[in-house]
Amino acid sequence: MNAAENQDARSFQPAANGGSLAGAALVIGAAGGLGAALVANLSSVAGGPSPYPAVLALSRSSLPAIDYGDEASLKAAADWVAAQCASRQMELRLLIVASGFLHGPQGQPERSFTQLDAGYLQHVFQVNAIGPALVMKHFLPLLPKQGRCVAAFVSARVGSIGDNALGGWYGYRASKAALNQLVKTASVELTRRNRQSVCVALHPGTVDTALSQPFAKTGLKVRPAEGAASDLLAVIQCLTPGDTGCLLDYKGLKLPF
């Protein structure tokens, strides 16, 4: 990933070595701050044609809509994506899952094990791990069996067990650790199916979105969603099959699981 480390954070371009085959890109979680920025960046690449001439977006408010609590909605959405690709005579070459949950009416991240709550844990795992697992079930089969393709799941550095020195945020940390394991396991199966496939978990940094807003008020440094999206797409462009199954940050550096 040295190339990604040296690449300008705002320079998402078609790979010079033809690393991407033209095809469709799909962003799931497109209504969120980061997801919307990813769609916008993919849809308007400065300086040249996009390697993804068709950009599809799905969210809870899209048509069709997806609901991680309703697996039938995921199957219906996958069928829609397959039909969209077929009508354009394109293959799905890029899948990005940018959905995530940290806080809301269901609860807040825990500071202590005395604050652990079953309802919050169930919801954070539903959105951050179970939902993406069902995305794998219904959308990974749409990726081609030949040629480069990428499945990227937005994770978080706090999901790293080896990097956990602060504690707290039990549910969020554990759900992202579960996502990382799901990504690793799926990467093994995808490689058997297509040796040029790449399946990774990506840490975007702390992005200025609704997810981070309550914590930005405490002085936590946040990054604009547009910049975070450009950084992630620059990393994606430099990925090789040797990176599959890894957790990487927005600079392309590998993080411990």
Task: Map each language-model feature to its residues.
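Non-catalytic terminal and boundary segments that flank Rossmann-like NAD(P)-dependent oxidoreductase
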Residues: 1-26, 40
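Rossmann-fold scaffold of SDR-type NAD(P)-dependent oxidoreductases
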Residues: 28-29, 90-107, 128, 153, ...
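N-terminal Rossmann NAD(P)H-binding glycine-rich loop of SDR-like oxidoreductase domains
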Residues: 28-44
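Rossmann-fold cofactor-recognition segment
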Residues: 58-80
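Catalytic loop of short-chain dehydrogenase/reductase
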Residues: 101-105, 109-124, 130, 144-193
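Conserved internal alpha-helix within the Rossmann fold of NAD(P)-dependent oxidoreductases
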Residues: 131-136
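Short beta-loop-alpha junction of Rossmann-like oxidoreductase domains
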Residues: 162-163, 194, 203-215
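C-terminal helical subdomain
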Residues: 201, 209, 217-257
